[in-house]
């Protein structure tokens, strides 16, 4: 079973592809339902800094830290889904596991895990 955090566009499509093996975690829950986690929670753009200055931090970091806190005492497989923003200007796509991250803005810094 896979605990899915964040059933937005990517999470919802993953869920529909692997529905029998995936359980969506309620947005207010921090404790995973299984030892395998797919974490896709994120704000959807990098323009919140103009009118909701703490939204990216609250969404991208606080919730992540609270979920990770529940994972401290046991062994979990934690898959964190990020975005191309973390590679910054001059980044090459497709990125690989060894690609250098060079975030250029506040949103992308919160996504660099």
Label each residue range with its predicted role.
Residues 102-113:
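Active-site Tyr-X1-5-Lys
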Residues 20-30:
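NAD(P)-binding Rossmann-fold cofactor-contacting core
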